[in-house]
């Protein structure tokens, strides 16, 4: 999709919300995004012909919800979609069909690509102390395996690897001092 064909929300300002509740919850910039429970953002779009709502999910950030919205409107409206981000047309996946479940699944996958690290759901499980074998046999076995493994030579330096570069070694170490006073 060409960038000239894209309509970005910045170029087409949103209409003012009529009801007070929507004034308080909807995002001031992003289309199709509103706040729920203070710290969560939800997203939904309407199908162009049937006017049925397609629920896209709840997200920790407004940016993620806006990306989900962009995936859905690209699937439903194609080139006439009004996007929240100008790079969404080439950066985000477009669902294979206009089925609401397919749109929802693709929108969730696209939003996950933009999940900030502080909202990561990855859980690191540390082993308990009982899982470590600290007995003499365990340590001795580990030492024997290390002794049997072949020694590896240290990695070559950059200068040794790159033979096309001429380097005057005296010039490299001219201002290098071993001691700082």
UniProtKB/Swiss-Prot annotation:
InterPro entries: AP2/ERF_dom, AP2/ERF_dom_sf, DNA-bd_dom_sf, DRE1A-I. PROSITE patterns: AP2_ERF. Residues 29-86 bind DNA. Pfam families: AP2. It is found in: Nucleus. Keywords: Activator, DNA-binding, Nucleus, Transcription, Transcription regulation. A motif (Nuclear localization signal) lies at residues 14-26. One of its GO terms (molecular function) is DNA-binding transcription factor activity. Gene3D superfamilies: AP2/ERF domain. GO terms for biological process: regulation of gibberellin biosynthetic process; regulation of timing of transition from vegetative to reproductive phase. GO terms for cellular component: nucleus. Its main location: nucleus. Transcriptional activator that binds specifically to the DNA sequence 5'-[AG]CCGAC-3'. Binding to the C-repeat/DRE element mediates cold or dehydration-inducible transcription. CBF/DREB1 factors play a key role in freezing tolerance and cold acclimation. Belongs to the AP2/ERF transcription factor family. ERF subfamily. This is Dehydration-responsive element-binding protein 1E. It comes from Arabidopsis thaliana (Mouse-ear cress). The lineage of its organism: Eukaryota, Viridiplantae, Streptophyta, Embryophyta, Tracheophyta. The gene is DREB1E.
């Amino acid at each position: 999709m060409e960038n000239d064909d894209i309509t970005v929300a910045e170029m087409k300002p949103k209409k003012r919300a009529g009801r007070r509740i929507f004034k308080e919850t909807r995002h001031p910039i992003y289309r199709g995004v509103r706040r729920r429970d203070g710290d969560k953002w939800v997203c939904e779009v309407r199908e162009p012909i049937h006017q049925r709502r397609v629920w896209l999910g709840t997200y920790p950030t407004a940016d993620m919800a806006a990306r989900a919205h962009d995936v859905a409107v690209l699937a439903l409206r194609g080139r006439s979609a009004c996007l929240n981000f100008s790079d969404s047309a080439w950066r985000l996946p477009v669902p294979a069909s206009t089925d609401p479940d397919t749109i929802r699944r693709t929108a969730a996958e696209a939003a996950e690509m933009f999940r900030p690290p502080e909202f990561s759901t990855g859980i690191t499980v540390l082993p308990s102390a009982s899982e470590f074998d600290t007995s003499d046999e365990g340590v001795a076995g580990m030492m024997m395996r290390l002794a049997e493994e072949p020694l590896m030579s240290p990695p070559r330096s950059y200068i040794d690897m790159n033979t096309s570069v001429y380097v005057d070694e005296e010039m490299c170490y001219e201002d290098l001092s071993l001691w700082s006073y």
